[in-house]
């Protein structure tokens, strides 16, 4: 089985080594194509106005000066040649990708691009606490990642579905189990704009997260609730975003 791995944290991110280790537990035909620089939050952006620069950093390890989407396209359509990958793994992201994160996440986008190419694709993310932000533990991802991917692959992944896996911020022996979840939703206002001043007194801004606003009680059955209860969250996400429930009503409204 040929596996293509990517991420959005960049070619030198610790989580990329973790995704490679997970991949090597499944196959010895593993290829790494990841962004040259950190691309967190770029979502499914595609580089159309700038050339892509490709650098081989080691055997079957390549850095692309572009987005995670660019990396998957470069890997599948150029680097791997005539033999497409059988599986795309994106991650392991430093930080969870749940609720509204899936819209912004480059990790999710890397897996989605694999799905667009008709390949079974997984996004894997490791939650961390404030105390472990600088050095999150990857042991939980290493323990549960291979078995989740293997079991889902054996059962088969629908063509337009990407599997979003999030590991809780705890040691492997503290994980209560695996649970299939739906995408959650945070309180409004979890994003904030932080205004600061530079040395000349000019304003500049950071987009950040208001942790206090996000500390609501998550709905049962969601990815947020699973992580809060120390479960590994496995969420199937569809590429087709059509609102089928509203489609019929919209047809009536528009006559």
UniProtKB/Swiss-Prot annotation:
Record EC number: 3.1.3.5
Catalysed transformations (reactions): a ribonucleoside 5'-phosphate + H2O = a ribonucleoside + phosphate
Protein role: Nucleotidase that shows phosphatase activity on nucleoside 5'-monophosphates.
Gene Ontology MF terms in the entry: 3'-nucleotidase activity; 5'-nucleotidase activity; exopolyphosphatase activity; metal ion binding; nucleotide binding
Cofactor note: Binds 1 divalent metal cation per subunit.
Gene3D superfamilies xref list: Survival protein SurE-like phosphatase/nucleotidase (3.40.1210.10)
One Pfam match: SurE
Annotated binding of a divalent metal cation, by residue: 8-9, 40, 93
Main location: cytoplasm
Domain of life, source organism: Bacteria
Name this polypeptide is given: 5'-nucleotidase SurE
Annotated TM spans: none
UniProt feature coiled coil, ranges: none
GO CC annotations on file: cytoplasm
Keywords annotated in UniProt: Cytoplasm, Hydrolase, Metal-binding, Nucleotide-binding
Compartments (UniProt record): Cytoplasm
Enzyme kind, highest EC tier: hydrolase
Cofactor: a divalent metal cation
Provenance organism: Bradyrhizobium sp. (strain BTAi1 / ATCC BAA-1182)
HAMAP family xref list: SurE (MF_00060)
Family listed: Belongs to the SurE nucleotidase family.
């Amino acid at each position: 089985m040929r596996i293509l791995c990517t991420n959005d944290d960049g070619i030198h991110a610790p989580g990329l080594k973790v995704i490679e280790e997970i991949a090597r537990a499944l196959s010895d035909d593993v290829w790494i194509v990841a962004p040259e620089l950190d691309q967190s939050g770029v979502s499914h952006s595609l580089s159309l106005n700038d050339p892509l620069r490709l650098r081989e950093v080691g055997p079957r390890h390549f850095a692309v000066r572009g987005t995670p989407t660019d990396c998957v396209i470069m890997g599948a359509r150029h680097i791997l040649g005539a033999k497409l990958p059988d599986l795309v793994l994106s991650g392991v992201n430093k930080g969870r990708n749940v609720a509204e994160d899936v819209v912004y996440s480059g990790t999710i986008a890397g897996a989605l691009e694999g799905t667009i190419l008709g390949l079974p694709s997984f996004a894997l993310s490791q939650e961390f606490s404030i105390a472990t932000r600088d050095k999150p533990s990857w042991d939980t991802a290493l323990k549960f990642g291979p078995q989740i991917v293997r079991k889902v692959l054996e059962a088969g992944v629908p063509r337009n579905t990407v599997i979003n896996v999030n590991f809780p911020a705890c040691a492997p022996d503290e994980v209560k189990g695996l649970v299939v979840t739906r995408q959650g939703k945070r309180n409004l206002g979890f994003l904030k704009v932080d205004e600061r001043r530079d040395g000349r007194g000019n304003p500049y801004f950071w987009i950040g997260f208001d942790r206090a606003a996000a500390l609501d009680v998550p709905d049962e059955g969601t990815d947020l609730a699973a992580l809060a209860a120390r479960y590994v969250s496995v969420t199937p996400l569809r590429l087709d975003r059509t609102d089928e429930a509203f489609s019929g009503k919209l047809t009536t409204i528009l006559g």
